[in-house]
UniProtKB/Swiss-Prot annotation:
Gene of this entry: PLA1A
Catalytic activity: a 1,2-diacyl-sn-glycero-3-phospho-L-serine + H2O = a 2-acyl-sn-glycero-3-phospho-L-serine + a fatty acid + H(+); 1-hexadecanoyl-2-(5Z,8Z,11Z,14Z-eicosatetraenoyl)-sn-glycero-3-phospho-L-serine + H2O = 2-(5Z,8Z,11Z,14Z)-eicosatetraenoyl-sn-glycero-3-phospho-L-serine + hexadecanoate + H(+); a 1-acyl-sn-glycero-3-phospho-L-serine + H2O = sn-glycero-3-phospho-L-serine + a fatty acid + H(+)
Subcellular location: Secreted
Organism: Homo sapiens
Residue segments, region Involved in the recognition of diacyl-phospholipids: 374-456
Glycosylation sites noted in the Swiss-Prot or TrEMBL record: N79, N365
Protein name: Phospholipase A1 member A
Task performed by this protein: Hydrolyzes the ester bond of the acyl group attached at the sn-1 position of phosphatidylserines (phospholipase A1 activity) and 1-acyl-2-lysophosphatidylserines (lysophospholipase activity) in the pathway of phosphatidylserines acyl chain remodeling. Cleaves phosphatidylserines exposed on the outer leaflet of the plasma membrane of apoptotic cells producing 2-acyl-1-lysophosphatidylserines, which in turn enhance mast cell activation and histamine production.
Length: 456
């Protein structure tokens, strides 16, 4: 029986559809990678180590691909010709995913074209801190085995950059030891202090663990390590009591963790912003604030180190020095950047007692202050003042000669002097900018002067 007209139309239509679509030569759609996430544990089941490696690539920064073996890596978006960033978190009290990790990964992938691998060891880092410490060696071995798989794929040791947070910084150090210190870089974000301050260099992060090791210290009086552990060690705001963090224990968890986690947020901010988080070598924080360390000539030959992805932190000398303490001041919130200026006051006449002068920079309702102390029988004193706006945008400077007024007797002492300032690093004192006229100060009286500095 011949086909009816409707059947003929059906077959003809199907043939046309096949010719226009099925035979067009288009490849089937590329399957999307399966996205994985961090594990979650609790206080009772989080002590046994269980490691996941999650790969994030520039084309899909929000999707973590679970990569365990070589076949997983070959079938993923991993690119052996790019650099590899390995993020290792630290101790997790409650067994939860780090709140900062997603932002960190996305920011890192925006800042650089690289493979980013997050090491999830929630199982093994939860519960009791000392149990997590015991898992460090085993975790380091597992990470080393994983990195060996990358080397088989053609990755070079020097292209691997480990970023370790708190306890994760010492894990990174141990991994670096297993590779003979030939990994490219290790960044320790406030490396953990408990159990590590008195540990040997084989047991903790150390300058010998990679070609370049840096550490950012923000909580040296509590959860962070207080000793230098890298080639360059940034002691931010002296390494403790970060601005904007609670200073009293009644703030609870925030009091415990705010200073410690500031290193993470500083690093993320350094990746996001163009303003430099530049630091200056000095023997101590006190000496830095007193204006005794004005450049980076010793030991960096003028190349001041900076937080972020700049190669070797911007340090260009070889061989690299070790355990160099560098200091910087920050604001209380992102982007945290501060400019540092030297301020000097030269007395016209010597005095038989110390002279304390408060100096304040003003710009667009933003103020920054510092104190200059001139020792008795000395001509001048100096200090460091940090300001969020560029120096050339500061339009006024205020002075207050601080004196010990008594209730029954007002101090009417007057001093005269010359004020000068310069932006750090001060490599040439001829670049100092001085007020054109001497400053007359009476005890406890505020004096304002216009400040004009050209923008370069």
């Amino acid at each position: 029986m011949p086909p009816g007209p409707w059947e003929s139309c059906f077959w003809v239509g199907g043939l046309i559809l096949w010719l226009s679509v099925g035979s067009s030569g288009d490849a089937p759609p590329t399957p999307q990678p399966k996205c994985a996430d961090f594990q979650s544990a609790n206080l009772f089941e989080g002590t046994d180590l269980k490691v996941q490696f999650l790969l994030f690539v520039p084309s899909n920064p929000s999707c973590g691909q679970l990569v365990e073996g070589s076949s997983d890596l070959q079938n993923s978006g991993f690119n052996a010709t790019l650099g590899t960033k390995l993020i290792i978190h630290g101790f997790r009290v409650l067994g939860t995913k780090p709140s900062w990790i997603d932002t960190f990964i996305r920011t890192l992938l925006r800042a650089t074209n690289a493979n980013v691998i997050a090491v999830d060891w929630i199982y093994g880092s939860t519960g009791v801190y000392f149990s997590a410490v015991k898992n460090v060696i085993k975790l380091s071995l597992e990470i080393s085995l994983f990195l060996n798989k990358l080397l088989v794929l053609g990755v070079s040791e020097s292209s691997i950059h480990i970023i370790g947070v708190s306890l994760g910084a010492h894990v990174g150090g141990m991994v670096g030891q297993l590779f003979g210190g030939q990994l490219g870089q290790i960044t320790g974000l406030d490396p953990a202090g408990p159990e590590y301050t008195r540990a040997s260099v084989e047991e903790r992060l150390d300058a010998g663990d990679a070609l370049f090791v840096e550490a950012i210290h923000t909580d040296t009086d509590n959860l962070g390590i207080r000793i230098p552990v890298g080639h360059v060690d940034y002691f931010v705001n002296g390494g403790q009591d970060q601005p904007g963090c609670p200073t009293f224990f009644y703030a609870g968890y925030s009091y415990l963790i705010c200073d410690h986690m500031r290193a993470v947020h500083l690093y993320i901010s350094a990746l996001e912003n163009s303003c430099p988080l530049m630091a200056f070598p000095c023997a101590s924080y006190k000496a830095f604030l007193a204006g005794r360390c004005l450049d980076c000539f010793n030991p960096f030959l003028l190349s001041c180190p900076r937080i972020g992805l700049v190669e070797q932190g911007g340090v260009k000398i070889e061989p690299l020095p070790k355990e160099v303490k560098v200091y910087l001041l920050t604001t209380s919130s992102a982007p945290y950047c501060m400019h540092h200026s030297l301020v000097e006051f030269h007395l016209k006449e010597l005095r038989n007692k110390d002279t304390n002068i408060e100096v304040t920079f003003l710009s667009s309702n933003i103020t920054s202050s510092s104190k200059i102390t001139i020792p008795k029988q000395q001509r001048y004193g100096k200090g460091i003042i940090a300001h969020a706006t560029p120096q050339c945008q500061i339009n006024q400077v205020k002075f207050k000669f601080q004196s010990s007024n008594r209730v029954w007797k007002k101090d009417r002492t007057t001093i005269i002097g010359k004020f000068c300032t310069a932006l750090l690093p001060v490599n040439d004192r001829e670049k100092m900018v001085c007020l054109p006229e001497p400053v007359n100060l009476q005890a406890s009286v505020t004096v304002s002067c216009d400040l004009k500095i050209a923008c370069v």
